[in-house]
């Protein structure tokens, strides 16, 4: 069995880790970094860039540089959170035919899982380069508060990237695994506060140790899947835009290039203010008007940033109270607080969390790497490399069906340990009803319409009977990934209908297969592109070395040969401007054939040089015998 890699597919950054013996190891990508920006760019010449290369060109290509895609994955276009992003993102968010939030990239419609798959492919390649073997299996993490559609979409992204997703696990749970595996023995209750680039989670986790086996049991989880560092950046960007408008009378929101530069500067300023009390946002030539170029130079203090984002930090406190209440615990029951996600480096966040729990968060957990490490540990558990670890996660939201009067009737309540299975018997609402519609919902509201619709299906062939007589057994079965399977059975006729919830939206099997094929085709195209680049480099080297040899040969090279070589060189240089690898190779071969006389001259010159240097060495040796210099040491006067 090959390695199961652990991937933290983050909103802002992603990270990949593997089990190396009994220790998890975070892997460096091709750029030498342990985390990779979750940024994907589609360039004008058709190239797809991922990570740092994509980030570097964002200023000049804002419409086709995609970031924070995790905020759209598994979401409907009409969702309130998506509509908020539509107005502020430089790229174009559109509604797919099924109502999902998709993206328009250079006129092509693309699904968020398809785009996230590019990041996963880079993580896969990073692991393959390190291991020296193909990687086909992964554990991928998601925010604990992700709903069924978002989890399913994440699995789809894995498939498109060529990975079999062996398990989806919650990010705070993964962080707890990373923390708890090598920590002190005994029973502990920990709170994992996870504020990342786009999502927020809180999980209360109990770590029990019995006879050397550690059980990680999630007692409760809560959160907000649309709260994170991107929102903090937006507040600072808006402030800078308004300040510039007051000063210069120009609204930068109408200038995509300026906004992209401003986004980078705001992110940098936010990070600097975690360690400094003040920073300058200095952007020369940010824009121009009839009077000439305009420059931005605005001082931002830590206090100013904190005043801009205080309500965002406070938004994360309410879920902490709910999670503790759901776990049946008080603040004093928590032994350790762990911070995960880059945004937790902000001193204000650390202070608020410390105030709430009455204790300082631990500083020995890397907020950027803990989640990927935990995913790798779970991969090790699945392969049997990691023993004596049992992970008991929960479903974050209640699951149920719509019943008479538009009511949501839960079958599985939130914070139930998974995997789990629950059945309940329902009946018909009308006399002689021959079919029922099972409408599956996820959420905590009483009214069905206020919850997230996960999908619906019909159970037909119910025998005619007075209302309330037929017995229809509905079974909900949640697997270890937190994905729901629903069945409905008429106990009288034995008729049964089953579905795996794919949401009323989501990608269908045909779409996923098409994207898998496209990804494979792209991989082939990437391989051909690499080969073309290598051939071009060889040809460039050949052109350079041949010209140098022609120059060195001088009059020794016959005029006919020189003309033939110049002609072959021109043909090769013209070929280099094209994309045809075979043509470049043919022109290289042609140049080699007409350069045979030149090669002979070059070899003769090389041999003469060697002989000359040998003679010089011999003369020097003789001189060594004859000359015996006398010298005396002159000491410097101190």
Curated annotation (Swiss-Prot):
What residues bear Phosphothreonine in this entry? Answer: 199
Which portions of the chain have biased composition (kind: Low complexity)? 603-620
Q: Which UniProt keywords apply?
A: ATP-binding, Chaperone, Nucleotide-binding, Phosphoprotein, Stress response
Task: Describe the function of this protein.
Answer: Acts as a chaperone.
Organism for this UniProt entry: Cronobacter sakazakii (strain ATCC BAA-894)
Which protein, by its recorded name, is this?
A: Chaperone protein DnaK
| Region of interest called Disordered, as start-end residue ranges on this chain | 603-638
Keyword Metal-binding in record: no
Q: Superkingdom, according to UniProt?
A: Bacteria
What induces or represses expression of this protein, per its UniProt record? By stress conditions e.g. heat shock.
Family from the record: Belongs to the heat shock protein 70 family.
Q: Which gene is annotated as encoding this protein in its UniProt record?
A: dnaK
**Is the keyword ATP-binding assigned to this protein?**
yes
Q: Pfam families of this UniProt entry?
A: HSP70
Task: Cite a single GO MF annotation.
Answer: ATP-dependent protein folding chaperone
């Amino acid at each position: 069995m090959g390695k199961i890699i652990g991937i933290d597919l983050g909103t802002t950054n992603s990270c990949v880790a593997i089990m190396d013996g009994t220790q998890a190891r975070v892997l460096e990508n091709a750029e030498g970094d342990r985390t990779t920006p979750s940024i994907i760019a589609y360039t004008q010449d058709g190239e797809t860039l991922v990570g740092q290369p994509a980030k570097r060109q964002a200023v000049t290509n804002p419409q086709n540089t995609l970031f924070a895609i995790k905020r759209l994955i598994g979401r409907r276009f009409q969702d309130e959170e998506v509509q908020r992003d539509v107005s502020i993102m430089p790229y174009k968010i559109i509604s797919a035919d099924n109502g999902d939030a998709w993206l328009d990239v250079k006129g092509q419609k693309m699904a968020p899982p398809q785009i996230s798959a590019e990041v996963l492919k880079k993580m896969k390649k990073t692991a393959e380069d390190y291991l020296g073997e193909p990687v086909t299996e992964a554990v991928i993490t998601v925010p604990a508060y992700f709903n069924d559609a978002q989890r399913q979409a994440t699995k789809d992204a894995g498939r498109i990237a060529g990975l079999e997703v062996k398990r989806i696990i919650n990010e705070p749970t993964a962080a707890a695994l990373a923390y708890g595996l090598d920590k002190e023995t005994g029973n502990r209750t920990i709170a994992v506060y996870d504020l990342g680039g786009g999502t927020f989670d809180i999980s209360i986790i109990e770590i029990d140790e019995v006879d050397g086996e550690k059980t990680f049991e999630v007692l409760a989880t809560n959160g907000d899947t649309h709260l994170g560092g991107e929102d903090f950046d937006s507040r600072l960007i808006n402030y800078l835009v308004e300040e510039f408008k007051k000063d210069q009378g120009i609204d930068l929101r109408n200038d995509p290039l300026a906004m992209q530069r401003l986004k980078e500067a705001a992110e940098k300023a936010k990070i600097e203010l975690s360690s400094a009390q003040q920073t300058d946002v200095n952007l020369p030539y940010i824009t121009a008007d009839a009077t000439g170029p305009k420059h931005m130079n605005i001082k931002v203090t830590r206090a100013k940033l904190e005043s801009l984002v205080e309500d965002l930090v406070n938004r994360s406190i309410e879920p902490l109270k709910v999670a503790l209440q759901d776990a049946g615990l008080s603040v004093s029951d928590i032994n350790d607080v762990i911070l995960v996600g880059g945004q937790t480096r902000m001193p204000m966040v650390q202070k608020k969390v410390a105030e709430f729990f009455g204790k300082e968060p631990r500083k020995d957990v890397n907020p950027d790497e803990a989640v990927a490490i935990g995913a790798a540990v779970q991969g090790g558990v699945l392969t049997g490399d990691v023993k004596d670890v049992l992970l008991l996660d929960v479903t974050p939201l209640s699951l149920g069906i719509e019943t008479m009067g538009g009511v949501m009737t839960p079958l599985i309540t939130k914070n139930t340990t998974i995997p789990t299975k629950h059945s309940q018997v329902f009946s018909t609402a009308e006399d002689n009803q021959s079919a029922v519609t099972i409408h599956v919902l996820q959420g905590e509201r009483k009214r069905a319409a206020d919850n997230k619709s996960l999908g619906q299906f019909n159970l037909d062939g119910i025998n005619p009977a007075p209302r309330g007589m037929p017995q229809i057994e509905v079974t909900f079965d949640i697997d270890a990934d937190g994905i729901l399977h629903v069945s409905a059975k008429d106990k009288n006729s034995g008729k049964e209908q089953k579905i795996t919830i794919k949401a009323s939206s989501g990608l269908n099997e045909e779409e996923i297969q098409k994207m898998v094929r496209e990804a494979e085709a792209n991989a082939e195209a990437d391989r051909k592109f690499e080969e073309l680049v290598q051939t071009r480099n060889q040809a460039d080297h050949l052109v350079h070395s041949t010209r140098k040899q022609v120059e060195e040969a001088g009059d020794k090279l016959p005029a006919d040969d020189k003309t033939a070589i110049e002609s072959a060189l021109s043909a090769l240089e013209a070929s280099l401007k094209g994309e045809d690898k075979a043509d470049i190779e043919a022109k290289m071969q042609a140049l080699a054939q007409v350069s045979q006389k030149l090669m002979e001259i070059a070899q003769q010159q090389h041999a003469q040089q060697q002989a000359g240097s040998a003679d010089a060495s011999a003369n020097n040796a003789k001189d060594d015998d004859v000359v015996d210099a006398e010298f005396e040491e002159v000491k410097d006067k101190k």
